């Protein structure tokens, strides 16, 4: 299932929701606050995050190397969180939560933007595949719930006891912060973006907040304390209807990210997945 899901534009739309759930854990939020370049290089940081997630699924032998690279990168990340508690990026509870967020976000994104919700059998298959991704990241099976039925009590426990609206969460859903224009593309485009950025940034931040909060599972949204109105929900349902009609009919080159598209082509699996 991940072969069809992970590199598709719908997964990219849902990625900020998972990232925000991750940094709602005080230890993860503190690590990002203290060590990440997401403020000074947001576009580069996002690009590297997307590339890494693509390797987990489509990287073949490179997936294991990416898992080792990530663990080496995170090994020195440690400090004290906002409550004065010591944190370490590779602490079992912290690293496991970062990985665990993917499954409920995929599930909710499918409910919003997919043709239909996953069946119980599909959920079990997706979860089994997500466990395999965890192994790539160096997470032992014994440290993760082994079935969806075991996952949900763990998940609800983290929501109830751990998550909060951290400084980083507030920044990721804010509509009044400054984000620099993307430094990519030809010179004329960068110049045009710099000129138009004051007008473009406010609506882009509103869209970012809408997708981040809307594609987050409602129980996580409530646990973190993110506002979401009935009007927001109606707009999300309208957005989901548009996406579920448009995305399946897109050509492969527009529907999938380049890494996923190339891997699917090499595997002879470039056919459409009508989810």
Locate the predicted segments by residue.
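Mature, function-bearing regions of proteins
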Residues: 1-275
């Amino acid at each position: 299932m991940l072969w069809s899901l992970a590199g598709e534009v719908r997964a990219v739309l849902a990625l900020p929701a998972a990232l925000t759930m991750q940094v709602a854990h005080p230890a993860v939020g503190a690590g990002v606050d203290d060590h990440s370049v997401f403020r000074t290089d947001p576009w580069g940081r996002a690009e590297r995050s997307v590339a890494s997630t693509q390797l987990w699924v489509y990287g073949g032998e490179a997936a294991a190397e990416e898992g080792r690279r990530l663990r080496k990168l995170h090994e020195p990340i440690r400090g004290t969180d906002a409550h004065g508690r010591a944190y370490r990026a590779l602490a079992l509870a912290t690293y496991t939560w970062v990985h665990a967020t993917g499954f409920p976000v995929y599930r909710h994104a499918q409910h919003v933007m997919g043709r239909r919700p996953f069946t119980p059998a599909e959920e079990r298959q997706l979860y089994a595949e997500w466990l395999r991704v965890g192994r790539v990241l160096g997470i032992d099976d014994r440290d993760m719930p082994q079935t969806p039925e075991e996952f949900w009590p763990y998940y609800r426990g983290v929501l109830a006891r751990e998550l909060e609206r951290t400084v980083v969460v507030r920044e990721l859903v804010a509509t009044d912060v400054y984000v620099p224009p993307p430094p990519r593309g030809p010179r004329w485009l960068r110049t045009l973006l710099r000129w138009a950025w004051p007008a473009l940034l406010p609506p882009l931040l509103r869209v970012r907040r809408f997708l981040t909060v809307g594609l987050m599972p409602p129980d996580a949204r409530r646990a973190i304390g993110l506002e979401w109105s009935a009007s927001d929900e109606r707009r999300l349902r309208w957005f989901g209807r548009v996406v579920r009609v448009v995305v399946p009919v897109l050509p492969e080159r527009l529907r999938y990210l380049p890494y996923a598209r190339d891997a699917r082509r090499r595997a002879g699996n470039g056919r459409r997945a009508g989810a």
